Amino acid sequence: MIASKFGIGQQVRHSLLGYLGVVVDIDPEYSLDEPSPDELAVNDELRAAPWYHVVMEDDEGQPVHTYLAEAQLSSETQDEHPEQPSMDELARTIRKQLQAPRLRN
């Protein structure tokens, strides 16, 4: 079993670019189509580690879905981000849904 470092609804930062994001899904290993060598420079160890579907904002404040390796992310220590309140709201909404899911018939 592979343990993931981050959880769904957790706020994270891109380690190199510093962008704030929210984890919306986790894959136990890289699971998109087989990348060509020039598209993704990864080794087998990196591909076998968890990968995260993360929502971030572009420069215009529009949501962008990204797919990132665990090694590309770091924990976010702050709970509030006045410059990106939509990321705070998304994280709260996801965590709330995980704590009290609605049952459907």
Curated annotation (Swiss-Prot):
Keyword Cytoplasm included in the entry's annotation: yes
SUPFAM superfamilies: YccV-like (SSF141255)
Region of interest (Disordered), ranges: 74-105
Record keywords, A-Z: Cytoplasm, Stress response
Location(s), subcellular: Cytoplasm
Gene Ontology biological-process annotations: response to heat
Any one annotated GO CC term: cytoplasm
GO function terms (MF aspect): DNA binding
Coiled-coil segments: none
Gene3D superfamilies cross-referenced by the UniProt entry: Hemimethylated DNA-binding domain
Similarity remark: Belongs to the HspQ family.
HAMAP family found in the cross-reference section: HspQ
Function: Involved in the degradation of certain denaturated proteins, including DnaA, during heat shock stress.
Listed name of the protein: Heat shock protein HspQ
